[in-house]
Amino acid sequence: NLIDFYDFWLCEEIGFDNEKIRKLNLKESLPSDISNLNIVVLTKTKKNYSNDNLPLFGISDHIFKTFDDRPNLLTKREVRIQILADLELPKNGVIWDIGAGCGSIGLEALKLRPNLDLFCIDKRFGSKALILENSERLGVKPKFICEEDINNILNTKNLSPFEKPNRLVIGGCDKKTKLQIINSLDQWMSIGDIIVIPIIDFQTIKELKEELEDKNFKTNLNLIQTYKSLSIAEGMRLEPNNPVFLLTGKK
């Protein structure tokens, strides 16, 4: 949402006697006296982040720095909350966040359970620096951040920097890669360990669910559909977020 990243300045009648500049609050209704001769200027906000003021659980999306070219590329708060609940985070152990992006899931898990060892993996250039900055904002420290394609890691069997996961989040990759991850890491996981897979493509659910069950995971499937309110002239309307399926497997 742009209002989380920019201030909106309404400039009216520029160069004329009635020139006026004012800051807009887009969470409220627009002023009724806006001149027809206007332009809106967006200025990027600079915020000071202090983890002292953050909630323990349910951190707002705007706290996380995201990719400059994809500012909305993160797991939204409403979905992230459910993923963290489904992970049943232990006090101690190892969690892998594959397709970590800006690190929102793994880092919030680490804030909830500081004694966990977090391993973040994402292939996108710049993801490591992004996760490091967000870890500073949240006041947590991942054990290891790998800016690499998980396929390359699994194909070369270069798993020496990693510890066996007790909790595994598999996001940000296609069905074939998800299946390969399950096949490769299943032998590393023990009774009680949990995998959570966010899915937006309904067609992939059946095969992933069957693969987990073949590996002796007990599965559960939830659909997360949320709406956010937007202010309009008449009051308010609800804007739907993209629906997300959460497939959970418990060993």
Regions of interest found by a model, annotated:
Residues 1-70:
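A contiguous loop/helix-start segment that scaffolds small-molecule binding in enzyme catalytic cores
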Residues 184-245:
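C-terminal substrate-binding/active-site "lid" region of AdoMet-derived donor-dependent transferases
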Residues 115-119:
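Short beta-strand element of Class I
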Residues 92-101:
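Conserved class I S-adenosyl-L-methionine
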Residues 102-114:
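Conserved SAM-binding loop of SAM-dependent methyltransferases across substrates and taxa
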Residues 121-165:
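S-adenosyl-L-methionine
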Residues 175-184:
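A short, conserved alpha-helix within the catalytic core of class I
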Residues 74-91:
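Conserved alpha-helix/loop element of class I SAM-dependent methyltransferases that forms part
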